[in-house]
Amino acid sequence: MAENGDKEQLDLDTKICEQIEYYFGDHNLPRDKFLKQQVLLDNGWVPLETMIKFNRLSKLTTDFNIILQALKKSKTELLEINEEKCKIRRSPAKPLPELNEDYKNSFKHRSVYIKGFPTITNLDEIKEWLNDKGPIENIQMRRTLQREFKGSVFLVFNTEDGAKKFLEDKNLKYKDNDMIILSREEYFAKKNEERKLNKSEEKAKSKQEKEEAQKQAEDAERKLMEERVGCLLKFSGDLDNMTSREDLHALFQTHGEIEWIDFSRGAKEGIVLFKMNAKEALDKAKAANNDNLKLKGKNVKWELIEGDAEKEALKKIMEGKQESFNKRKGRDGRKFKGKGRGGKGNDSSPRKKIQFQGKKKTFDSSDDEDDMEESESPQKVTIKAKETAGPKNGASAAPGSPKKRALDDKAEDGPAVKQSKTEVGDQ
C-alpha cells in the first residue's frame, strides 16, 4: 500500500512539474499574454496564489506545499522559488531563446504532424500515449471554430533528434487507429499540392459551369427567337412628331396583343413585336380600317420582317428588353432607401439609438486549413485566433513570438503560433 501511495505521489509531482514548466517554457511563455504581464510585475516572480487559478494546475492541486515539494524534485532547474516560498519564476540563468532564423529553423525541424486520433480524444490521453516517445515541448490539438477536435495534432519535440526518431516509426498506432505522421515541412508541402489541385479543379469546374450557362443562355435565346418568328411588323413614313408607343397600342388593341415596341418619339420608323402572328394582327387592323391603316392621321408603310433581317431585329429587341429590365430593377432597388432630400428621411419618428456592442471578432476557418485554440487565464476563459502580442518594453524574459498563420500561408513562414493566455485543452 505504501508503495502505491509513493507511486501516486511521484506521478502527481511529475504532472505538477510538467504543467508549471510548460507555463514558463520556451513555447508557451512568449505566447501567453496574461502570464507575460504577470512576469513583468515583480522581476519575474509570480505568486502561487495566481498560479493555482490556472485551470489544469488547479485540477492537479491547489496546495502550495505540494506544489513547492514537487518543484524541488525537478531536475530541469527551469524554475526558482523565492525565500518566502510564496512565489516562483523562470530562472534568469535560463532565458528564453532569441527568436532568430536559427530558432525558426529548429522549430520547424522539431515539429511533427500526427493525424488519426478519434475526435473524442482528450489532451491527457494523447500525453499518456506520448509518454515513452521522447521529451515534448508542446502539444497543439487542432480544433475547428466550433471547438471540435479534428483528430490531428502538432507536436514540438525538445530536440531535432527526438522529432527525427519519432518520424522514423511508420507503424505507430493509437489504439487500433493507423496514424498519419509527417514532418511539418512534409505536411505543408502536401497541403500546398492539395491547394493547387483544388484550385485547378475549381478553375475547371468554373469554366465548365460558365460554358454550360452560356449554352443554356444560347438555347433559351434560340427558343425565344423561334417562338417569335413571324411576329415582327415594321412601320415607317412621314410620322407625326408626337407619335408615341401608346398610339400603336391603341391602333392594335383589339387586333393583336403587343409584347414590345422598338420606337422613340420623333423617329420615322419602328418595329412592333406581337405575341401572335404579325400578319394576322395587321390584316385584322386593316380590315377594321377599310384597308387604310393610318397612324395618328399619317399614311404609314407596314412591312412584315422575315429572314436574316428578322433575326437581327429580334436580337436587337431582346437586348433592348433586357436593358430596360435591368434599369427598372435598379430603380426599384433604390425606391425605398431614402425619404425627402438627400435620401436622409423626413419622417417625424425619432431615430433609433444603436448601442455599441464592442469590436466584432471574425475567424477564418476551413476544415483542414485553420486552427483555433481556446486559451485560459485565471477567472476568465476567452477564445483567441490569429493574434500575436509582442514583448512589452522592458520585458527581458519574453521575446516576440512568431506570427500565427493559417495553414494556407507559405510553409516557410514559420511555426503556427497562437496568442494564448495559457492552456485549456492544448497543454
UniProtKB/Swiss-Prot annotation:
Q: Where is the composition biased (Basic residues)?
A: 327-342, 351-360
Q: Which organism is it from?
A: Xenopus laevis
Q: What are this entry's molecular-function GO terms? A: mRNA binding
Key words, A-Z: Nucleus, Phosphoprotein, RNA-binding
Q: Where is this motif: Nuclear localization signal?
A: 315-331
Tell me the Pfam families matching this sequence.
La, RRM_1, RRM_3
Phosphoprotein as a keyword?
A: yes
Q: What is this protein called?
A: Lupus La protein homolog B
Span list, region Disordered: 193-220, 319-427
Instruction: Name the job this protein performs.
Output: La protein plays a role in the transcription of RNA polymerase III. It is most probably a transcription termination factor. Binds to the 3' termini of virtually all nascent polymerase III transcripts.
Q: Where is the composition biased (Basic and acidic residues)?
A: 405-427
